[in-house]
């Protein structure tokens, strides 16, 4: 841990770091300046950007495991990727990145000069970082973390105990922001100092964490108080419920190499005006493609055309491969649907799907996630509300998200349906044929399955962390297969502690017991 935290407070040039699970981010490569001279707004902006992106696209593995993507034919892949025999360095970048962000957030808190709006944002982002670390690894350093001089080898805290404190941190963050009447943070590139939207974000985040433990017989001690406070705040302040209240982060992306949205630049080379090699590396996963196709038994799930592209100019030619099943080539595998049309042209301004334009924001938390969280909580009698109406709003919001941006008539033989997201969503949800448990909340025999299935497909290309947690705590959706590589074990319930901890914090990491992928997180099944 000492190596992790040595320069925590001065990592100001990490905005471009993708935190891919396959890359070790070595913080010792940075040449830090004196942190005492740094404007906290210049620290806040990159933290919001990086925390949003690592959750959005920081792990290819979770997108594979959740049935969204697979690896294209012709790409060299070691078998350990498919059968989960990777080593302790595989998720090391995730660990080091989150602790780096936490250290920078602590710097903001220490230099806020009494501005409680900054402090409320810091507490909120701390919760995002810590809960994602727990959801991946289990027990982690918490109370002694970020105190390198006092605790060079910090002890690990019990994950459930940390969650209990995270609820309290969110209560505190909400109060700090609601009661603040002074200057707003200039570095707030998510809500531009809108207190009401920050409170909605906090409420939605707290509901996410409430649902994590909702099926446990014994809840964390502060759970009841947190839920009471959440219900009181939600009654007056609400949850994320629209594009305007979504947690979207944008530092000012524009059409220049290194300055565009990082997801877009992953697939589109701005300076060369062409696709990158990543476009052919990532292919559609059969689990998601087949789910979208189920809708075509009736009205049709036209999100398929916004998420994936036909592999040729026949509009019915969609195909995915299961992760772990080797493919010889990409000729009959769909890639991502992106740009201005399926033939690969991309102006950088008028796209659809998840790759719309170079200046699109990074989603931290979307309205459709919020609606599905509320729908599950209402169905489970945790919060008041009409779970059917909330579910329908979630589906509509996801259709709108994927349709947003222009959808011109493409060249070739591909014909798209009318660009009316709400009408298509409503038609999709009123189908009476096909696997109605997947989409019709009025006819389903298992509303929870329907809610979680739509939440899963809606998070495709948006946030694989959340469905990975849902699957481990509920077992839904059942058609998530992880890897179909011959002999591959069950989907990991957690990931290994990083090798850097074994090198620098040996006794404390070993005190956590056997470091295996089959050990469930405290809220897991």
Question: What are these model-derived regions, one by one?
Answer:
Residues 2-5, 375, 451:
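Gram-positive Sec-dependent secretion signals
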Residues 20-68, 89, 96, 107, ...:
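Membrane-proximal, proline-rich intrinsically disordered regions
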Residues 20-27, 73-81, 137-144, 412-430:
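Short, compositionally biased low-complexity segments
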Residues 1-29:
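Bacterial Sec-dependent N-terminal signal peptides
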Residues 37-41, 72-406, 444-446, 454:
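Structured, solvent-exposed acidic/aromatic patches
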Residues 398-525:
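C-terminal functional modules
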């Amino acid at each position: 841990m000492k190596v992790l935290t040595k320069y925590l407070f001065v990592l100001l040039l990490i905005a471009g770091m993708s935190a891919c699970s396959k890359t070790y981010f070595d913080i010792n490569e940075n040449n830090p300046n004196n942190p005492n001279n740094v404007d906290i707004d210049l620290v806040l902006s990159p933290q919001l950007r990086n925390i949003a992106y690592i959750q959005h696209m920081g792990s290819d593995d979770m997108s594979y495991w959740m049935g969204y993507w697979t690896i294209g034919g012709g790409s060299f892949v070691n078998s350990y990727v498919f059968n989960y025999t990777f080593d302790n360095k595989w998720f090391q970048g995730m660990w080091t990145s989150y602790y780096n962000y936490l250290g920078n957030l602590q710097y903001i808190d220490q230099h806020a000069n009494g501005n409680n709006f900054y402090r409320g944002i810091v507490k909120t982002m701390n919760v995002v970082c810590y809960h994602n670390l727990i959801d991946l690894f289990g027990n982690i350093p918490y109370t002694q973390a970020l105190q390198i001089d006092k605790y060079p080898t910090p002890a690990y805290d019990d994950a459930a105990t940390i969650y209990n404190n995270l609820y309290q941190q969110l209560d505190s963050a909400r109060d700090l922001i609601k009661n603040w009447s002074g200057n707003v943070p200039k570095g707030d590139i998510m809500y531009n100092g809108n207190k009401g939207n920050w409170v909605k974000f906090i409420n939605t985040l707290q509901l996410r964490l409430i649902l994590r433990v909702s099926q446990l017989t014994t809840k964390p001690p502060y759970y009841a108080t947190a839920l009471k406070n959440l219900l009181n705040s939600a009654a007056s302040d609400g949850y994320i419920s629209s594009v305007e209240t979504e947690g979207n982060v944008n530092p000012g992306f524009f059409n220049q190499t290194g300055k565009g949205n990082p997801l877009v630049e992953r697939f589109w080379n701005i300076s060369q005006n062409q696709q990158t090699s990543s476009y052919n590396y990532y292919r559609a996963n059969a689990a998601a493609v087949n789910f979208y196709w189920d809708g075509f038994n009736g009205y049709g799930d036209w999100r398929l055309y916004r998420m994936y592209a036909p592999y040729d100019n026949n509009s019915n030619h969609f195909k995915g491969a299961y992760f772990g099943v080797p493919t010889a080539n990409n000729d009959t595998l769909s890639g991502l649907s992106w740009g201005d049309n399926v033939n690969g042209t991309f102006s950088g301004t008028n796209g659809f799907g998840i790759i719309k334009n170079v200046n699109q924001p990074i989603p931290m938390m979307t309205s459709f996630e919020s609606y599905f969280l509320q729908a599950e909580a209402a169905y489970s009698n945790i919060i008041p509300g009409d779970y059917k109406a909330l579910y329908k709003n979630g589906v509509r919001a996801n259709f709108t998200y994927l349709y947003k941006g222009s959808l011109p008539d493409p060249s070739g033989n591909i014909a798209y349906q009318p660009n009316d997201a709400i009408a298509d969503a409503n038609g999709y949800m009123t189908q009476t044929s096909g696997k109605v448990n997947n989409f019709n909340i009025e006819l389903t025999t298992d509303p929870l399955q329907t809610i979680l299935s739509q939440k899963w497909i809606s998070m495709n290309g948006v946030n694989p962390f959340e469905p990975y947690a849902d699957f481990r705590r509920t077992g839904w959706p059942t058609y998530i297969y992880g890897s179909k590589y011959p002999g591959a074990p069950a989907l990991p319930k957690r990931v290994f502690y990083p090798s850097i901890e074994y090198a620098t914090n040996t006794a404390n990491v070993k005190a956590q017991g056997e470091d295996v992928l089959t050990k469930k997180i405290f809220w897991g099944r």
